[in-house]
Amino acid sequence: MDAPRALAAKPPTGRKMKARAPPPPGKPAAQNVHSEQKLPHDATLGSQQSLVYMKEALQNSTLDITVVLPSGLEKQSVVSGSHAMMDLLVELCLQNHLNPSHHVLEIWSSETQQPLSFKPNTLIGSLNVHTVLLKEKVPEERVKPGLTKAPEKSVRLVVNYLRTQKAVVRVSPEVPLQNILPVICAKCEVNPEHVILLRDNVAGEELELSKSLNELGIKELYAWDNRREMFRKSSLGNDETDKEKKKFLGFFKANKRSNSKAEHLGLSGADSDEDPAKSASGGDLNGCVTTPNSPSLHSRSLTLGPSLSLGNISGVSMKSDMKKRRAPPPPSPKLLGQDKVSEKASLSSQADLQKKKRRAPAPPPPQQPPPSPVVPNRKEDKEENRKSTVGVGRQVPQKPPRGTARGPPQLVLPPPPPYPPPDTDVTEPVTFPGEGAGSETSELRPKLSLPLGPGSHCSMGGVSQVPAESEETASEDTTEDSGVMSSPSDAISLDSQQDSMRSKDKWSTDQEDGSDQDLAGTPELGPQKSPSWGKSGSGSSILRTEKATMPTNDDEDLFITGHLHQTLAELDEDLEGMEENYETDTSSLTNSVNGVSNHSLQEAIIPDSGVDDIPVTFIGEVSDEPFDSGLFSSRCNNATTFNTGSIASQRSHLSPSQTEHSQPFVRTSRKEPDPSPPSQDNRKRNQPTLANTSENENPVETDPTVTSLVSKLLIDDPKAKDKGKVHGSSHSEKTQAGHGINSLRVNPRDGKDESSNSAPPPWSHHGQALGGSYGLKYGLTTYKIVPPKSEMRCYDRDVSLSTGAIKIDELGNLVSPHMNGSRTISPPSAVVETDTPPIGKVKEFWRRNSMEKYLNGPAECTIKRAPSTTITATPEKPQQDNGMKAAFTVTTPQQQPASQEYGAHLEEERSRPQSAVSCSVKVPASNPTDITFLKPQRRTSSQYVASAIAKKMGPPKVHADVVRPHKATTEQCHEEAKLARSPPTRKDDAAPNLHSEARQHEHGTNQSSVCLPSNPGVQLPAGGHPKVEVNSTYGKSSTQDYPAAVHRNSYFLPGRSSHRDRVSVGQSCGFNEKQTTSNQKANSTSNFSQALDKAHPPPLLLAEARDSGRILMNGSARTPGNCEPPHSPKESTLTSYIILQTEEKPSSLSTDGQDADDTLPSSIFGPKKKFKPVIQRPLPKDVSLHSALMEAIHSSGGREKLRKTAEQTSEGRPKKPSYVEAESERSALLAAIRGHSGTLSLRKVSSLASEELQSFRNAALGAPGLDKPQQEDLGLPPPPALPPPPAPAPQAPSASVTVSRFSTGTPSNSVNARQALMDAIRSGTGAARLRKVPLLV
């Protein structure tokens, strides 16, 4: 406490410091200061004390003073001596009605007759006052400062002089230029006599000195010194000299040199802007010797003298960048001046020089002595120009390894379309525009391209082929081409042991090129150096070595043509050998599994050598491809094992037409959008493969069947892969033979692509894997896609032979690749894909594989799961799961709105661990092992774009045992969800919904189950894609139109058919929305798939679907006996009960829903009619009573129905106390209503009650339109009518009756009355509430 007080007491430090400022030097001063400091303190004390004393002394004293008013009037007054002067002023002003603020006091002493100075608080008694003058204040006239002088306006004038120099001067824009000229000259250090002001140094327009800057409208001018710059026009317009001057920093040295040279040559300075002699001497320069006197370019060229060798000429013509290129002089420059080579070189184009620069470093041993490199360079340049493979115009540091590697690839660079193994002639003619001299080169290309297939343009059969002219220009940009071209040869060299070192160098160079290629999005499909090339076979490597040697010969063309035939034969042998080798290799297992893809890939010569898991640049396109994602992913996984060489060789066998077709396939596959999001998942998985597949895509798409087989093969576990070897090889043979056919078959789509293929197919650029190790760096739209962890890994990592390969779960869903060699193409869906989208194919493949395994071992599991229907349905995959869930809700468009809400309920339920249906839907692997597989899928779906497949496969599957306990809960969940959404969807279903609701409450368990609320009479059009609300266990619900893709996904295994049958059975019960739990599960899963399958049933599944009675006719479709799989007794009871319910009140359920449905064109699967989604909230349990009452009122014939419904609902929930009071008409009416006794009981009770009921009936009839909307709106109880003044209870009904009776004409009144009654009933308050709210309108 003390510290704060001390601080508070302390004066501010700033003031203290000022008060104690150091005193002036000298002790006396210090003493004076101290005394002064002390005196004021004492004085103040004394004054204060004296004041007190004076006040006391003067308090009783009075003074007689003379007051002189402002008007001059004098007035005598007596004033107390204790008054202060200010007080005196105020008093005097008050007495004389004056304003104190406008007056002042002036005191005259009686002795001195002089005015006295005083303070406002000075006591009058202390002063010797005799006269007081009261004067008006004179306002002091303040001298207003004069207007500030506005600053003179000025602008910044930019003065250019001596061509390159600038100066900025601030001058007035209003002043004539002649007044500004001295300032400009002073700034520029020039003589005003020799300066002429020009508008600019180009036009040379002279400015009038009499005009100002504003008049001329300029802020920049050129001050031309007519003495320094003799040649104004020529020099001012000489941009080159300006650049030269700017570039040269050593002005003085450059000037001296140029001057001396100019003088020596006898130049009068025509090129120089200033007199060389003066510039040299510096005279008349005014210190501004900043510009070179003569253009260095001309002087240099002249000084070169007679030696106008190519190098010198290039030095003159080439730019600085060219100079840099020439920096590392190749060994040949000396020879150029001496030999004929020099003459040829002088004629060679700058492109040749550039290439020289690149090749300047001594070529690897394979190249010829220094003189030869020049000529080969030219040839290479020509080839490169035609093929744009070497990147003619590229200005890049020399890459010696590339140079060596380039030689062979240059010849090959223009890859012709796939060359039939023996048909070199055919391939040769295939040249691209701009390959003027390329007939030979084209021949060479086929040869080289065969071995180069994996990395070379040739591999794509013209992927990078572009008109030679364009290629030359593009070569620099598309260094990818050159890099790629070298890379193919490099890849081959990798195969060859002799070229192993060279291949390493090329490897690095290719990678560098790959980085360059990334910019251009190298079109080359073939991955440049997949290790698989090593496997490709010594033959291919030998070919490459031969090729490497071939370019060295001057007769390259002939030599190459000769080799072409040889290489073709060798390739054929190599292909056979390699195929065998592939099969033998463990990696070949996957390759053989991919055999189909390999052969198909043959079409695309691009073996998966690029399998570097390089996601192909065309990510967007990938999704479009109908190829099996499984195939792609398997490729990616097996890419390393893939023997791209074999593929390349195989592809070489393919006829060019086949390859062409295959190429279109690749394109079309990418182009064709996958309707189903799952396909996107496939894309994700496949994209890495697509990089490979892009090369291989041609075969991939060749045949949907082939693709399906391939995908299956790829997907299958090692066992499947082993099978795949045989099957793949056989299938690959089929594909080889049938590639043309397949490609043709696919070509209807691809036809478009074929046309584009003639030009370097754009997809080829995308598909081409660029630099060997830079798989991810690709121009175009390359997205670095981390290959999704293959789902197969999730299946069984132990079983997988290849790390990335898709694996088969224990159930073997993906096990047998050849089980379903032919893919059933779903009926043409809205989607462009003629073939089922890759997702559908993959899923189909999975299903079939799983079907095989199901037929064998997994059949047992399927049987166990049969009760849970959903499990068998699950083989469809996560996509199915989502789709099935969606289908459950979507079975009918009408139900979609409800199903959405319902879907929300389902999602909530699913979130609970008991999600039997959703889990079962996800049963693709119907084992806990599958669950592990599925979980990674779930991650994949979240991690990768549009992983619909992952979603469908993701959710863990519920085992049969788990499903059974959940069956009842599932039913309840389904029913609850149905109730929640069905009331808005169908008024008639309200009661059944209640019942289901009650059932759910009885079971008291919520299960995440997908319910297929199928409105009776709602039929899905055969062609229509039911909108599927996908409620994934993830909690996501996506309503999507699932075309063939979804249907493909929804194809069921044999086990599933039984589940579907169950679903249909539940539907046949007529209680579509309330199906037994197992049925509901099956129905949800199977119905979803059914709806999908119905829309596009796979050929195999159509019969199955029919057998399973998937066709739902107004919910009355009967499924064959086999359709009903084991139902738990509870299920059967529920089903029968539901059937009874629906039959008991068929009219109420079906009248509205069926009528609405019948009006619309309907197919077997239901009406196409769509309803706007209605936001539905779970309604109170009494909603069903209300709906039942309304139905009874409308139909007046459903009393029995209503009674039964009430009984049903009463089972589920405790009956409400019936307030039956015989003495009260009102109570009787309420009792009748509660008991659903109908009008008869009311009539029996009393006439008043009957009248009221009749009035309700009339009101309902009078405003039927109102009733329905209200019924629909029951989800939110209408506000009760405002209670009128209370009336006797018995009279209320009658009053309401009369009012309603009269108000039939005015529906609003009847609506209010009816709403009030409805509210009472709905709220469950019963008679008590009605008593409280008498309906007196």
From Swiss-Prot:
GO annotation terms (biological process): actin crosslink formation; actin cytoskeleton organization; actin filament network formation; actin filament polymerization; collateral sprouting in absence of injury; digestive tract development; embryonic axis specification; floor plate development
Chief localization: membrane
Modified residues annotated as Phosphoserine in this record: S47, S50, S212, S235, S272, S294, S346, S349, S372, S649, S816, S1038, S1128, S1303
UniProt entry tagged with the keyword Isomerase: no
Subcellular localization(s) per the UniProt record: Cell membrane; Cytoplasm, Cytoskeleton; Cell projection, Ruffle; Cytoplasm
Disordered: region residues: 1-41, 260-556, 647-768, 892-923, 967-991, 1070-1094, 1113-1133, 1145-1168, 1192-1221, 1262-1310
Compositional bias annotation for Acidic residues: 469-480
Keywords: Actin-binding, Cell membrane, Cell projection, Cytoplasm, Cytoskeleton, Membrane, Phosphoprotein, Repeat
Gene Ontology cellular component annotations, sorted alphabetically: axon; axonal growth cone; cell cortex; cytoskeleton; dendrite; dendritic growth cone; membrane; neuronal cell body
Motif (KKRRAP 1): 323-328
Composition bias, Basic and acidic residues: 377-387, 714-736, 1197-1214
Bilayer topology: Peripheral membrane protein
Gene Ontology MF, one: actin monomer binding
Low complexity composition bias: residue spans: 526-541
Domain WH2, chain residue ranges per copy: 1185-1205, 1225-1245, 1313-1333
Its job: Plays an important role in the reorganization of the actin cytoskeleton. Binds to and sequesters actin monomers (G actin). Nucleates actin polymerization by assembling three actin monomers in cross-filament orientation and thereby promotes growth of actin filaments at the barbed end. Can also mediate actin depolymerization at barbed ends and severing of actin filaments. Promotes formation of cell ruffles. Regulates neuron morphogenesis and increases branching of axons and dendrites. Regulates dendrite branching in Purkinje cells.
Binding partners and assembly: Identified in a complex composed of COBL, PACSIN1 and WASL. Interacts with PACSIN1, PACSIN2 and PACSIN3. Identified in a complex composed of ACTA1, COBL, GSN and TMSB4X. Interacts (via WH2 domains) with actin monomers. Interacts with DBNL.
Xref: PANTHER family: PROTEIN CORDON-BLEU
Name the UniProt record assigns to this protein: Protein cordon-bleu
Organismal lineage: Eukaryota, Metazoa, Chordata, Craniata, Vertebrata
